Amino acid sequence: MHCAILKAEAVDGAHLMQIFWHDGAESLYPAVWLRDNCQCSDCYLHSAKARKLLLEALDVNIRIDDLTFDRKKVYITWPNDHYSEFEANWLKKRCFSQQARARLQGELFLPECQYWGSELQLPTLNFEDVLNDDDHAYKWLSSLKKVGIVRLTGAADKRGEIIKLGKRIGFLYLTFYGHTWQVQDKIDANNVAYTTGKLSFHTDYPALHHPPGVQLLHCIKQTVTGGDSEIVDGFNVCQKLKEKNPQAFHILSSTFVDFTDIGVDYCDFSVQSKHKIIELDDKGQVVRVNFNNATRDTVFDVPIERVQPFYAALKEFVDLMNSKEYKYTFKMNPGDVITFDNWRLLHGRRSYEAGTEISRHLEGAYADWDVVMSRLRILRQRVTNGN
């Protein structure tokens, strides 16, 4: 963004700065915000990209004492003779207009979301390419953010491969099941995933108040019959539920549900949480689905008259997930790694037969969306700027 200032002046009793840009646009900036974001070395630690100015020292009613400008900068003197300079590009990017704010939020958080159903074309990349090439790693994470799932092929059929992916993004998310965990048939299993039975659509770990955002599953060994993976775009199904039955959507997006997980693995644990199954932001958009029927608690903290309507709403939601129109079924091969948005996708598994030896083995891990988004922003900068 290359911007040129045509005119800048203090207005509204010097409580605002107005800029007229060469492209014909206009911007207003509050004086208190400008003073708060002074970029001088006394107010801003450039080595940490962090504000040094203490809020206690900020006059929230401050006025601009003097203002000059050229095409590339604005120069402000404040009542206590403090001096600030602001670059045109920096100011234009932070314009308070609705359009400019939406554009910047889009750059920061990459909200684009591509809904899908059974017609999904599963994004696929090579495992080694993602590890060794920034362009491929950027495609991986940007597709993960937009579509919600990416398959990587060509990993070795041994444990430890997803640890490499963890290092590629930064680090993995430690839970009570360890840094990584083995999905295979186990005697006295401490999780229903460690059996051969069918797993219905679920998100992982709603028993935590902050469930892991991204899941990684690496296929090391696959059974000949059964064990197919099933996924569904939870955001898409939520939208369809809202269209079909607004009351059911309202119940699931307003009722807190108890989840629990108790056992011993990485250490002993006793976890309790409360979530709305459909979690909305302040604009009413779905931002997370929290649902695991296995760990939904027997405790249900609602008045008795709300119990049956809740079950009816939940049953309709689950029936929609299982309809052929929305679910996508595939079978992982040894060396495949699927990485997916655990806040958006629900996943399941078809049953398979137990044998005398382990016939199906996946290694799993989690990552936090903050870590993934951090790496995605860094990769975008490298790929788009060529450095």
Curated annotation (Swiss-Prot):
GO biological process entries: carnitine biosynthetic process
Annotated InterPro entries: AlphaKG_dependent_hydroxylases (IPR050411), GBBH-like (IPR012775), GBBH-like_N (IPR010376), GBBH-like_N_sf (IPR038492), TauD-like_sf (IPR042098), TauD/TfdA-like (IPR003819)
CDD domains in alphabetical order: CAS_like
Cellular compartment(s): Cytoplasm
Transmembrane segments: none
Binding site for Zn(2+): C38, C40, C43, H82
GO cellular component entries: cytosol; mitochondrion
Domain of life from the UniProt record: Eukaryota
Keywords (A to Z) from UniProt: Carnitine biosynthesis, Cytoplasm, Dioxygenase, Iron, Metal-binding, Oxidoreductase, Phosphoprotein, Zinc
EC number: 1.14.11.1
Binding site for Fe cation: H202, D204, H347
Record text on cofactor binding: Binds 1 Fe(2+) ion per subunit.
Entry protein name: Gamma-butyrobetaine dioxygenase
